[in-house]
From Swiss-Prot:
Gene3D superfamilies: Lactate dehydrogenase/glycoside hydrolase, family 4, C-terminal (3.90.110.10), NAD(P)-binding Rossmann-like Domain (3.40.50.720). NCBIfam families: L-LDH-NAD, PRK00066.1. The gene is LDHB. This is L-lactate dehydrogenase B chain. Pfam families: Ldh_1_C (PF02866), Ldh_1_N (PF00056). One of its GO terms (biological process) is lactate metabolic process. It is found in: Cytoplasm. NAD(+) binds at residues 29-57, 99, 138. PROSITE patterns: L_LDH. GO terms for cellular component: cytoplasm. Interconverts simultaneously and stereospecifically pyruvate and lactate with concomitant interconversion of NADH and NAD(+). The keyword Lyase does not apply. One of its GO terms (molecular function) is L-lactate dehydrogenase activity.
C-alpha cells in the first residue's frame, strides 16, 4: 500500500546527504544563541549544529529555532551532546567556557578554560578536520592560542573574533559624535580584545578625510574635544553592559555573523581579528592579537601591513607581553 508521501512525490534523483556550508556553534549560552540566530537570519549555512553539555537547554534551543524554520533559509538545524552532530562543518564557532568568579585571577580563569577546551577542540577536529575554528570565548586572544595548540590546525584556520566588535563599537561611537552612519566612519581598534587594545588614531577617517589632520591632537591628552574618551568607552562598554544586564550577547552575535559572512561567501573583506603575530611589529613570542586581516573561504589569507606610529607599535608590543606572561604559565598544552 503506497503511503501519502509516495502518492505525493515522484523521486528523480537521490537528495544530497552532505551539507556544503555547515556551521557549528559550541555553547548555547547567551552568546552562542545570539551567534546562532544572527547566522540563521543572514542565511549563511545549509545546516546549523548546536553542541553543549546541558542536554535539556540544548534540545529546547534547537526546537525553538526549528519552529522558526518557515521564516529562515536554513535547511537543517540539529543539536546534540555528542560531537558527531558537528561532522563536516565548514566553520565551528566556539563560545563555550567558564565564567570568571569573583576574586578569581585571569590566569586561574584561563587555566579552567584550557581544561574545557582540551575536551572540546579535539572532538571538533575529529569530526571536521578541514574546518575553520572561530574562537569567541574570553579571554579570546589567549584561548585562540590555546585552540591553535590543541587543534594542530594551521594558523590560517584558527581565528579569534578579536577586535571586530571593539572596532564596531568604536565606529558606532564615532558616528554618534559626527551624526554619520558607522559604515561611513572608518577606524581600527587593534591588539588585545580588552583593556590593552590600541586605537589607531592616525587611520581614523570619513570619506578618506583624515580626522587627525583636522585635529592633530586627536586621541591625545591635549585634545580639547576629548576623542580619547571614545576609546575608553570602547574598553569600558562591555563592563557597563554586563553591569546593566548581566552579560553581552547581541553585538557579539552580529559581529560573529559578519565574520562568517566573509568566510562563507569568500568575500575577502578585511577584519580586525586575532591571528598569530609572531614576527610582526617586533613581536617575538607566539601570541594572537588583532590586526587587519583578509578573510575568505580558506580562512585568514593575509594581514594588511598597517602603518603604525612608534607609540602604537609600543602599545601592541605591551599587549603581546601581557598575553605571553599569562600563556607561558599555562599547563597541559
Amino acid at each position: 500500500m503506497a503511503s501519502l508521501k509516495d502518492k505525493l512525490i515522484t523521486p528523480v534523483a537521490q537528495p544530497a546527504t552532505q551539507p556544503t556550508s555547515k556551521v557549528t556553534v559550541v555553547g548555547v549560552g547567551q552568546v552562542g544563541m545570539a551567534c546562532a540566530i544572527s547566522v540563521l537570519e543572514k542565511g549563511l549555512c545549509d545546516e546549523l549544529a548546536l553542541v553543549d553539555v546541558l542536554e535539556d537547554k540544548l534540545k529546547g534551543e534547537m526546537m525553538d529555532l526549528q519552529h522558526g524554520s518557515l521564516f529562515l533559509k536554513t535547511n537543517k538545524i540539529v543539536a546534540g551532546k555528542d560531537y558527531a552532530v558537528t561532522a563536516n562543518s565548514k566553520v565551528v564557532v566556539v563560545t563555550a567556557g567558564v565564567r570568571q568568579q569573583e576574586g578569581e585571577s585571569r590566569l586561574d580563569l584561563v587555566q579552567r578554560n584550557v581544561n574545557v577546551f582540551k575536551f572540546i577542540i579535539p572532538q571538533v577536529v575529529k569530526y571536521s578536520p578541514d574546518c575553520i575554528i572561530l574562537v569567541v570565548s574570553n579571554p579570546v586572544d589567549i584561548l585562540t592560542y590555546v585552540t591553535w595548540k590543541l587543534s594542530g590546525l594551521p594558523k590560517h584556520r584558527v581565528i579569534g573574533s578579536g577586535c571586530n566588535l571593539d572596532s564596531a563599537r568604536f565606529r558606532f561611537l564615532m558616528g554618534e559624535r559626527l551624526g554619520i552612519h558607522p559604515s561611513s566612519c572608518h577606524g581600527w581598534i587593534l591588539g588585545e580584545h580588552g583593556d590593552s587594545s590600541v586605537a589607531v588614531w592616525s587611520g581614523v577617517n570619513v570619506a578618506g578625510v583624515s580626522l587627525q589632520e583636522l585635529n592633530p591632537a586627536m586621541g591625545s591628552d591635549q585634545d580639547s574635544e576629548g576623542w580619547k574618551q571614545v576609546h575608553k568607552q570602547v574598553v569600558d562598554s562591555a563592563y557597563e553592559v554586563i553591569k546593566l544586564k548581566g552579560y553581552t550577547n547581541w553585538a557579539i552575535g552580529l559581529s560573529v555573523a559578519d565574520l562568517l559572512e566573509t568566510i562563507m561567501k569568500n568575500l575577502c573583506r578585511v577584519h580586525p581579528v586575532s591571528t598569530m603575530v609572531k614576527g610582526m611589529y617586533g613581536i617575538e613570542n607566539e601570541v594572537f592579537l588583532s590586526l587587519p586581516c583578509v578573510l575568505g573561504s580558506v580562512g585568514l589569507t593575509s594581514v594588511i601591513n598597517q602603518k603604525l606610529k612608534d607609540s602604537e607599535v609600543a602599545q601592541l608590543q605591551t599587549s603581546a607581553t601581557t598575553l605571553w606572561n599569562v600563556q607561558k604559565d599555562l599547563k597541559d598544552l
